[in-house]
From Swiss-Prot:
It is found in: Cell inner membrane. The gene is algI. Belongs to the membrane-bound acyltransferase family. It comes from Pseudomonas fluorescens. It is a multi-pass membrane protein. Its main location: membrane. This is Probable alginate O-acetylase AlgI. The keyword Cell inner membrane applies.
Length: 495
């Protein structure tokens, strides 16, 4: 089951929300757990055995680590055992092997996300950042909570533990959640799915022209953002409907003026996870300059490997790791107060080049695309491409980049760092390996929760209601479009 499907919109979600709000407060976590298991079992019922095993294992390991004491040798041994067992399936997936627990079943959808969350839980217990919970229902609901289950954000128990017991349910929060969900749905169905056809066709061409290659690269760059951030918006919106407030996962990443800044804004829950549980574990920046560069590179290399064993993901991770190390080495200002078009264009070029190899099935396809992009030969589209490209697809691509430019620049000038004479707000600038963690909001389409940092003209009542009305109309149009198209899963399902 996926969010962008009729069965979820018109069957699962209404039934769940109805039962949820009819239930008493003490039963809502149990109902959430059961609903999440139904959501997950929609793919394969036998996946639930693995799901339950992972949950019980990490619940037990957490108790053992907690009982052994913070950062003690016995706790370290329990932690190591927990991480090794948790990682078996992920490591076998990365190696291209069959998962260990379920014979003849591919690694279940979403396992990387809930394994990451389970590992972060037992590490936090070991470090003393959160106590080991004895409430099995709350812990199981945390692992299984369906809004983020398939493609994140990567949640942490220490951030949600209090919300499982003390979250609030208000009409404003529910309305905010509905708006956020609809925004994500529009991103996915209206924009990402339309651009997917363009990107797929361009990457499949055997002899692309320079124009074909750049069209495919730019279409995929926009598709991936609107697809993945759309899922995150829907997940965050669903959480708000249930009283939860999840961390933001995107903050207008394509406005970045460095790769370091890009990783503060892109897939924030994963980048902060890699920083807190991998980069810092490797030593961070505490063991000398060269070691810092090595740790940055290894963190991103392993981040690429997390996506799969395909050499393209590894090269993509190495590409980003290399530029992170270079920017660190030259002392680049990664929190600029002014917008520099040259720096932005160079950063965007690096990101697009990375997405080409990320999207390519193999190095041969990537080489074919790069060769066409930088041969600067025929800029016109091939006849095959012109025959398949529609006016709607072109218009969608233009609207996508206009949207990215408008909201990106608005975010930059609204939330840019303070003057050097004033201490910068770490919640706005810290979310990359080597820095301190921070919760970051993406003002992009968001209404309500970011009002404190938005200009007065944006938080006035009339534009808010006008935007919500526009979102509702586009949401209805997206549902009609969904009914007429074939099934289109989110891109990050494969990871």
């Amino acid at each position: 089951m996926v969010f962008s499907s009729n069965v979820f919109l018109f069957l699962f979600l209404p039934i769940f929300l109805g039962l949820y709000y009819l239930s008493g407060q003490r039963y809502r976590n149990l109902l959430l757990l059961l609903a999440s298991y139904v959501f997950y079992a929609w793919w394969r019922v036998d996946f639930l055995a693995l799901f339950a095993a992972v949950t019980l294992w990490n619940y037990w390991i957490g108790l053992k680590v907690g009982a052994a004491g913070v950062r003690t040798k016995p706790a370290q041994r329990w932690l190591l055992l927990g991480v090794v067992v948790d990682s078996i399936n992920v490591m076998m997936k990365s190696a291209g092997l069959e998962p260990f627990i379920l014979t003849h079943v591919l690694l279940p959808i979403g396992i990387s996300f809930y394994i990451f969350e389970s590992i972060s839980y037992i590490i936090d217990v070991y470090r003393g950042d959160t106590p080991a919970t004895r409430n099995l229902i709350d812990f199981a609901a945390f692992v299984a909570i369906f809004p983020h289950l398939i493609a994140g954000p990567v949640l942490r128990f220490r951030d949600l533990a209090d919300q499982f017991n003390n979250r609030t349910h208000t009409l404003d929060k529910f309305s905010e959640g509905c708006t956020r969900f609809m925004q994500g749905f529009i991103k996915k169905v209206f924009i990402a799915d339309t651009l997917a056809v363009v990107a797929d066709h361009c990457f499949a061409l055997q002899n692309p022209t320079t124009g074909d290659a750049w069209l495919g690269a730019l279409a995929y760059t926009a598709q991936l953002y609107f697809d993945f951030s759309g899922y995150s918006d829907m997940a965050i919106g669903l959480g708000l409907m249930m009283g939860f407030r999840f961390m933001e996962n995107f903050k207008q990443p394509y406005i970045s003026q460095s790769i370091t800044e890009f990783w503060r804004r892109w897939h924030i829950s994963l980048s902060t996870w890699l920083r807190d549980y991998l980069y810092i574990t490797l030593g961070g920046n505490r063991k000398g300059t060269l070691t810092t560069y090595r740790n940055l590179f290894l963190t991103m290399l392993l981040g690429g490997l997390w996506h799969g064993a395909n050499i393209t993901y590894i090269v993509w991770g190495a590409w980003h790791g290399m530029w992170l190390a270079i920017e660190k080495a030259i002392g680049l200002n990664t929190s600029p107060r002014s917008f520099n078009p040259v720096r932005w264009a160079f950063t965007f070029l690096l990101v697009v080049m990375g997405w080409v190899i990320f999207r390519a099935e193999n190095l041969h396809v990537a080489g074919r695309m790069y060769g066409a992009m930088f041969s600067f030969g025929e800029w016109s589209l091939s006849e095959l491409n012109r025959a398949n490209l529609t006016g709607l697809q072109v218009a969608t691509l233009v609207v996508a980049y206009a949207t990215l430019a408008f909201f990106g620049l608005r975010d930059f000038y609204t939330n840019r760092p303070a003057e050097k004479t004033k201490p910068a707000d770490p919640s706005l600038i810290k979310a990359v390996p080597g820095d301190n963690p921070g919760s970051i909001h993406e003002p992009g389409f968001t209404v309500g929760q970011d009002a404190a940092v938005q200009p007065a003209y944006w938080t006035a009542d009339w534009p808010r209601y006008a935007m919500r009305a526009a979102v509702l109309l586009l949401f209805v149009a997206s549902i009609l479009k969904l009914s007429a198209q074939s099934f289109s899963p989110f891109l990050y399902f494969q990871f």
